[in-house]
Amino acid sequence: MRIFFFAYVLPTVISLLLGCQGAIAALGVDITKGNTEKVKISVAPMHSSTNLEKEIGKSCIRVMLRDLNSTGIFDASWKLPAGGFSTTSEGMPDSNAWTSVAKDVLVTGSIKEFAQGRVKVKLFIWDVASGRQLSGKSFNFATGNWRRAAHSMSDSIYSRITGEGGYFNTRIAYVAETGLPGSRRIAIMDQDGANNIYITGRGEFVSTPRFSPDARNLVYMSYAKSGGSVVLHDLETGYSTALGGVRGVNSSPRFSPDGRHVLLSESAQGSTNIYSIDLKSGKSTRLTNDRSINTSASYSPDKKSIVFNSDRSGRPQLYVMNADGTNQRRISSGKGGYSAPAWSPRGDWIAFTKTEGKSFHVGVMKPDGSGERLLAKGYMVDSPSWSPNGRVILFTQQDPPSATHPFRSRLVTVDITGTNTQILDVPTNASNAHWSPVLRE
């Protein structure tokens, strides 16, 4: 097999020479369509020399398997052939025993502590059918950051096989609540539910946390004072400040793609209108000006357009306008009401919540209003938020009240095809979630 003639020399060059599209074509992976047959990935134990290396390697693989299997397009497993499996000190296969368990893709690697409290993982991805190395990459990290490193490894595998960016090394901000008055807190966790922390204390009514494009800051609504205010929170320093510039009751804050502006809605004198706040100067610019309710504004990724919902036609519908507020036009045309729009980071879709009769849906449509598709339905579903690669949607799902669960609100994801739904592991009831960009390694 040609696989054994590769050495760990210039893996990036090897990856470029082989090309991504050949592997994708061979495996038949198209994440924009519902895949009926999953790509089978076998992950081999990492070559290690010490107990510390061995345990971190095992922990990383467990996280990688969970990440990959959550996509609905992979069947990833940690298997060993009957005769055992061995790799070189660099993590390269040194026998053909792997062919008995690996069908589509084989992942091998090595882990080595190279300094006090720091390790290096070398990860290799192999195409089983051709016996070729698809990629090789190194990950250097502090031992305490092994989980984030594992998510980055998952991103590397996902990206190499699908040709799309990964979304595993990310965080989710949400509102943690019990359903009782005054029991809402802003919380942040990894996308798989790990490392949950609270940003705000108890007794403060808060809502709609939204990450900045660099994931260093949050904006959210706080109603600790009368009228409510938009709070800008620095996640690195813990410092919070209220945004000024707009009077009245504020709501629905969201960053611009470059992080220089925040969109929000202001309610005053019987109407609600959308403003843009320049974070450097504090200057506010009014973008809508009528007697209706205009809210939930979201920029397009190129910052040239804004989608929002408005009841100016009698019930909530989706509208798009230029970034300066001109050329406002309605894009939704189906039955029912539309709300909570969120523009995909790819620019190709707008996610929304739709109510029709007693039914709630999460769906997508193109920016011109065409191609509407409903992806998820529930007793009450709301607040869609995109993964950074624009292929998965996170939303809130509230279950009907029962004797055992008078209030139950969960975070759920659905892929762009509507075929793969996952319930996230969250320690409390949760709502109003927002997905961060991919974190820096």
Swiss-Prot record:
Keywords: Cell cycle, Cell division, Periplasm, Signal. GO terms for biological process: cell division; protein import. The keyword Cell division applies. It comes from the Bacteria. One of its GO terms (cellular component) is periplasmic space. Its main location: periplasm. It is found in: Periplasm. The keyword Signal applies. InterPro entries: 6-blade_b-propeller_TolB-like, PD40, Tol-Pal_TolB, TolB_N. Residues 1-25 form the signal peptide. Part of the Tol-Pal system, which plays a role in outer membrane invagination during cell division and is important for maintaining outer membrane integrity. Belongs to the TolB family. PANTHER family: PROTEIN TOLB (PTHR36842:SF1), PROTEIN TOLB HOMOLOG (PTHR36842). The Tol-Pal system is composed of five core proteins: the inner membrane proteins TolA, TolQ and TolR, the periplasmic protein TolB and the outer membrane protein Pal. They form a network linking the inner and outer membranes and the peptidoglycan layer. This is Tol-Pal system protein TolB. It comes from Anaplasma marginale (strain St. Maries). The lineage of its organism: Bacteria, Pseudomonadati, Pseudomonadota, Alphaproteobacteria, Rickettsiales.
